[in-house]
Curated annotation (Swiss-Prot):
Belongs to the melC1 family. It comes from Streptomyces glaucescens. Residues 1-32 form the signal peptide. The gene is melC1. This is Tyrosinase cofactor. Predicted to be exported by the Tat system. The position of the signal peptide cleavage has not been experimentally proven. GO terms for molecular function: copper ion binding. One of its GO terms (biological process) is melanin biosynthetic process.
Length: 134
């Protein structure tokens, strides 16, 4: 039996980590692929898995979220619009499915609703100003 060296131990650990990472990525992708039985993206105009609409008052601020109609280039959130007191909060969905906003872009959250709540927390009562469009 060959002697166990540091090089062999690190090589084996790297191989195990790569195998575990591949399996961890492949399993959710396989589950998600067969998990959207509904109308196609072309039929609805929205991406599968688009978050549900919401309209609530959070800490005295009205936050709303809904699929954006026709916002292909303006909305990087996969066609989803978030409003705080009627002013649009620019949101974007990351490749991993998390969401960020222009107010709290270093703190990814799981949903647009959570992004709106995080923005309200960060604003601390200040008014949200419209994001300038170029």
């Amino acid at each position: 039996m060959p002697e166990l060296s540091r090089r062999r131990a690190l090589g084996a650990a790297a191989a195990l980590a790569a195998a575990a990472g591949t399996q961890a990525v492949a399993a959710p992708a396989a589950t998600a692929a067969g998990h959207h039985p509904g109308p196609s993206t072309a039929a609805t105009g929205h991406h599968p898995g688009t978050p549900a609409s919401f309209d609530e008052v959070y800490k005295g601020r009205r936050i709303q979220g809904r699929p954006a109609a026709g916002g292909h280039h303006q909305h990087h959130g996969g066609g989803y619009a978030v409003l705080i007191d009627g002013v649009e909060l620019h949101v974007m969905q990351n490749a991993d499915g998390s969401w960020i906003s222009v107010v709290s872009h270093y703190d990814p959250v799981p949903t647009p609703r959570a992004a709106a709540r995080a923005a309200v927390d960060e604003l601390q009562g200040a008014r949200l100003l419209p994001f300038p469009a170029n």
